[in-house]
């Protein structure tokens, strides 16, 4: 819109005609006439000098246009090469999404970047280019915990870009199911929040599913209070997801102590309810305000500014090592004293860095638990492979959930 507005204003200036002699009246005639004593008019009363700023702008804009033209040519040339890569992948039976390759590209570009382009914008630009590249190789369908404007939807778009087909699902279970059936190539699900901890439903589903973790993404979470009207006085009911309520508990108690809090299955569903009901509001993202035509009554109402959710991309792909990877495991131990310690001991002895440990009931036997572990490194690394092999020998059950590039934007 800014570029369009700029073009419109320049065109409007070009359409304004110069005043006629009659319109200029005595000003123009006085400038052209000699003085009474016969002297020529002074330089200050003649035609204005050319605008040096305008000439410089024209020169700079011309240079920018040339660069834009070259960028367009280079991007199209890149996409032509991508099509050739896609043909080779298809012939070899390889998947379109190559998280290791994309991670290596990002790392290389970030290392080469000398500014003024910042890393966040660089990632955004090349995310869109890579999304267009994947779409040319093979149209991609990505499913997520919906509806539109959930934080999972935002995380999916930030990871995959705009050039894929997004398919919302009403539950995390449905996301797993659609990928398992093959109707969608990948799914995006939340797995943990920096404030509220693990998303247990996601962890539980990995126990039964054969899907792999193909990538991870950290998404900053910021909550807004949305309503049809922009006044706190009129709000009697607030809808939101339980985790969003928990993350905004202090603000809601302070500013809406008398409001009824009603849990919804997602923040986006809460926004939809607020749009349909008088006197209702929702705790949701600013993106939801645009989609459901709501007003942002208050922004950034979360109790803690450093609120981040980790999302996982699930699919069937085995991701190759990048050198900056993470491996996720799940295992079940025997129900005897010291069993967990013995299974984890190989990690300590190998010098690997364990970055997550979580437990969940197996639901197949009372007081039986499975454990989730994340370690730095890739299963193709000798140290990781040897450690996992030792852990498997000490467990009743062990499964590798996937090795994938570590996300850089925490």
Where do the PLM segments sit?
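Domain-level signature for soluble enzymes in the chorismate/prephenate branch of the shikimate pathway
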Residues: 2-410
């Amino acid at each position: 819109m800014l570029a369009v507005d700029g073009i419109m204003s320049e065109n409007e200036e070009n359409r304004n005609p110069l005043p006629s002699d009659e319109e200029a009246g005595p000003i123009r005639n006085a400038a052209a006439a000699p003085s009474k004593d016969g002297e020529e008019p002074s330089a200050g009363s003649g035609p204005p000098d050319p605008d040096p700023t305008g000439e410089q702008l024209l020169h700079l804009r011309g240079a920018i246009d040339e660069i834009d033209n070259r960028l367009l040519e280079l991007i199209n040339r890149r996409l032509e090469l991508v099509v050739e890569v896609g043909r080779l992948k298809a012939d070899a039976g390889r998947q379109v999404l190559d998280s290791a390759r994309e991670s290596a590209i990002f790392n290389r570009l970030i290392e080469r970047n000398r500014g003024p382009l910042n890393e966040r914008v660089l990632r955004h630009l090349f995310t869109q280019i890579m999304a267009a590249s994947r779409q040319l190789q093979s149209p991609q369908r990505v499913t997520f915990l919906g509806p539109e404007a959930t934080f999972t939807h935002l995380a999916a778009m930030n990871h995959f870009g705009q050039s894929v087909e997004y398919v919302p699902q009403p539950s995390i279970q449905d996301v797993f199911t659609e990928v398992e059936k093959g109707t969608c190539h990948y799914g995006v699900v939340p797995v943990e929040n920096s404030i509220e901890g693990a998303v247990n439903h996601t962890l539980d589903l990995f126990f039964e599913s054969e899907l792999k973790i193909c990538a991870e993404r950290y998404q900053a979470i910021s909550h807004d209070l949305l309503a049809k009207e922009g006044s706190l006085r009129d709000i009697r009911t607030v809808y939101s997801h339980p985790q969003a309520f928990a993350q905004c508990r202090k603000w809601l108690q302070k500013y809406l102590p008398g409001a009824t809090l009603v849990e919804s299955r997602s923040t986006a569903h809460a926004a939809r309810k607020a749009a349909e009901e008088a006197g209702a509001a929702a705790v949701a993202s600013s993106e939801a305000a645009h989609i459901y035509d709501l007003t942002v009554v208050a922004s950034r109402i979360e109790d803690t500014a450093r609120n981040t959710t980790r999302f996982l991309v699930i699919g069937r792909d085995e991701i190759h090592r990048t050198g900056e990877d993470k491996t996720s495991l799940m295992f079940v131990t025997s129900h005897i004293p010291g069993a967990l310690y013995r299974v984890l001991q190989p990690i300590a002895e190998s010098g690997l860095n364990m970055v997550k440990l979580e437990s969940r009931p197996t639901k197949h036997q009372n007081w039986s638990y499975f454990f989730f572990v994340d370690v730095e490194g890739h299963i193709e690394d000798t140290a990781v492979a040897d450690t996992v092999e030792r852990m498997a020998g000490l467990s009743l059950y062990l499964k590798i959930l996937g090795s994938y590039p570590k996300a850089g934007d925490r």
